From Swiss-Prot:
Miscellaneous notes: GRHL genes (GRHL1, GRHL2 and GRHL3) show a paradoxal lack of redundancy despite their extensive sequence identity in the DNA-binding and protein dimerization domains and the fact that the core consensus DNA binding sites are identical. They have related but remarkably different functions during embryogenesis because of their differential spatiotemporal expression patterns during development.
Location(s), subcellular: Nucleus
Main location: nucleus
Name of encoding gene: grhl3
Keyword Secreted included in the entry's annotation: no
Species this chain originates from: Xenopus laevis
Lineage of the organism: Eukaryota, Metazoa, Chordata, Craniata, Vertebrata
Residue segments, region Disordered: 484-505
Job description of the protein: Transcription factor playing important roles in primary neurulation and in the differentiation of stratified epithelia of both ectodermal and endodermal origin. Binds directly to the consensus DNA sequence 5'-AACCGGTT-3' acting as an activator and repressor on distinct target genes.
A GO BP entry: regulation of transcription by RNA polymerase II
Protein name: Grainyhead-like protein 3 homolog
Start and end residues of each stretch annotated as Transcription activation: 29-92
Family: Belongs to the grh/CP2 family. Grainyhead subfamily.
GO cellular component: nucleus
Gene Ontology molecular-function annotations: DNA-binding transcription activator activity, RNA polymerase II-specific; RNA polymerase II cis-regulatory region sequence-specific DNA binding
């Protein structure tokens, strides 16, 4: 039994200012108070029931040892020399050993003993760590300088051994010694638990507002512009691939274009650039195969006018972009100012599964690609290109696909999580989204021309409802947007675009209806001036043009303004009005109220 006492003089490893020291005259005075209340059989049974057999044995040994009077304790010969050796090697801790070993540990153990039935299993294991060290000397690493000891059969001797200081530090660092202010009270047995971190915080952490992550942006890619698609980004993306977004067929999504905050020096001829938003297949695919897929899709549409990509007639488009043009069935272009952020709403009318005649085939991923050109040079100078993958579903399929990916992600993370956190997962799952927007990835390939689809139909239908805007600078520039016609078979060659007449380029289409009507009438202004408006009203309502003498415009704020040529020239196509025709002294007064 002498080995159990060998470690008592070296329990205090260093003079740590964080440990509260207690002073006591000697060990017997400290233990005399505890011997007045010896351990009862009920206390021992309770401790054993909680699995603390080591604690019962250790406390029993200490009680038996201090019951013997000090003068009757036997200390073996040779122990004193070794104790002196330890004291000389640890002289800096000499004044603290007695106070720490006798008072601090014994008071700490006694507190644990008196409230054992109130502690949890984890607390008990921490409380008796020091006793475990006493009863299991093999846990300490002995140096080659350890001296032999002569044990005693009846009593524990105060012999000491030399141990590595680092081993002692490692062993006793976890021992928790509460300060007087932190000592637990009988009416408050358990400490207040610290809040546990959310088990899925690595999943739910929102991504930073920046461009695509650095791991898949090529270092030499142009980062002068940033394009975002306001649709949640897919969770599972293969390494090195462009980000992917899930979209619904026929639903309009905003696309934002802006200049990067830290913009490189781009030598533009003006502040305006021309961007082409297109839906294309991977540029690495054979262009003939791409055109075959577009033709297959177009042949299955209910009308020949069905386009792949549409632009919404939202006011946000008119405020930030201009000269919106449908250059192909799968592409549209517009002009915007690099000093302002541009926003345009696009909708897609195809599904990822529309390009195969077989049912049950996995959908083909498409690319949403944005090419930006210097406006003054037409499409001769490509300055930026970015892409992202898109998969198009029907009937809210994009939302279902996102929910499926979320469940898989939580299931994968939940395998290592505690079952007690089901409430946390259930509360977070419904509203979770990987990312609210999808950033388009800049690419370095600025040479490959995208394949644009223009079917063999009347090309005046390319401009919807009379929307005739400025075309590309010339025919050679238009052809540079797609692969040269020499690379296509004769049957797949796209014919040149129809040239617009100067008369068509000035037409403006307005929608008007009366207060009592529910359906709008279309007014086609052959010339964007007051004369053209009077002529259109006269033809539509069969009124003599000479009887129309006043034309007013009533703003939403109620302001009545005389209509003139400047106001009409600034009208965009498809603007809607309420038409009021009033007879005044045999003449007609026209009032257009904004909606």
């Amino acid at each position: 039994m002498s080995n159990e006492l060998d470690y008592r003089p070296v329990m205090l490893l260093q003079n740590d200012i964080s440990l509260q020291k207690y002073s006591s005259p000697n060990d017997d005075d400290a233990w005399s108070k505890y011997l007045e209340n010896p351990m009862t059989a009920a206390t021992k049974a309770m401790m054993r029931a909680n699995g603390d057999d080591d604690g019962v044995a250790a406390l029993s040994l200490l009680y038996d040892y201090y019951r013997v009077p000090k003068e009757k304790r036997i200390i073996t010969q040779g122990s004193t020399g070794r104790c002196d050796q330890v004291k000389r090697s640890c002289s800096e801790y000499e004044s603290d050993i007695s106070a720490y070993e006798s008072t601090q540990i014994m008071r700490y153990l006694n507190d644990n003993n008196s409230s054992t039935h109130e502690y949890s299993e984890t607390h008990k294991k921490n409380s008796y760590l020091s006793l475990d060290c006493l009863l299991n000397p093999s846990k300490l690493t002995l140096t080659s300088g350890k001296l032999d000891t002569n044990g005693h059969d009846d009593f524990m001797a105060t012999t000491c051994d030399v141990y590595e200081k680092n081993s002692l530090n490692t062993l006793f660092d976890p021992i928790h010694v509460p300060s007087p202010q932190q000592r637990w009270q009988p009416d408050s047995t358990f400490k207040e638990d610290t809040p546990e971190p959310l088990i899925f915080n690595d999943i739910l952490r929102r991504q930073a507002e920046s461009t695509c992550s650095e791991d898949y942006i090529p270092g030499e890619a142009n980062r002068d512009f940033e394009y975002t698609l306001e649709s949640p980004k897919a969770i599972h993306i293969k390494s090195g691939e462009s980000p992917m977004a899930y979209l619904n067929k026929g639903q309009f999504y905003p696309v934002n274009l802006r200049t990067a905050e830290i913009r490189k020096c781009v030598h533009l001829t003006s502040n305006k650039v021309k961007s082409v938003v297109m839906v294309v297949f991977d540029n690495e695919k054979n262009p003939e195969e791409q055109l075959k897929r577009w033709k297959h899709w177009h042949s299955r549409q209910p009308t020949a006018k069905q386009r792949v990509i549409d632009v919404a007639d939202y006011k946000e488009n008119c405020n930030t972009v201009e000269n919106i043009e449908e250059v192909a069935y799968n592409a549209l272009s517009f002009v915007w100012n690099v000093n302002d952020e541009a926003k345009i709403f696009i909708g897609l009318n195809c599904l990822s599964t529309d390009f195969s005649s077989q049912k049950g085939v996995k959908g083909v991923p498409l690319n949403l690609q944005i090419d930006t050109y210097d406006f003054e040079t037409g499409v001769k100078r490509l300055i930026h290109r970015a892409v992202c993958q898109i998969k198009i579903f029907c009937d809210k399929g994009a939302e279902r696909k996102m929910r499926d990916e979320e469940r898989k992600q939580f299931r994968r993370k939940g395998k290592c999580a505690d079952q007690n956190n089901k409430d946390i997962k259930a509360s977070v799952l419904p509203g979770y989204r990987g990312s609210d927007v999808t950033y388009l990835r800049p690419v370095t390939d600025m040479e490959t021309h995208p394949v644009l689809f223009i079917p063999n139909i009347h090309y005046s239908n390319l401009q919807r409802c009379g929307v005739i805007l400025q075309s590309v600078a010339d025919n050679s520039d238009r052809l540079s947007l797609k692969r040269s016609s020499q690379s296509f078979p004769k049957g797949l060659e796209a014919p040149p675009s129809k040239q617009q007449t100067s008369e068509d380029s000035h037409r403006v289409l307005l929608y008007v209806r009366r207060e009592t009507e529910e359906v709008f009438d279309a007014l086609m202004l052959k010339t964007p001036d007051l004369k053209g408006l009077r002529n259109a009203i006269s033809e539509k309502y069969e009124l003599p043009e000479e009887r129309i003498f006043r034309v007013y415009k009533k703003c939403k704020r109620g302001i009545l303004v005389n209509m003139d040529n400047n106001i009409i020239q600034h009208y965009s196509n498809h603007v809607a009005f309420l038409l009021d025709l009033t007879d005044v002294d045999g003449k007609i007064q026209v009032t257009l109220k904004e909606l």
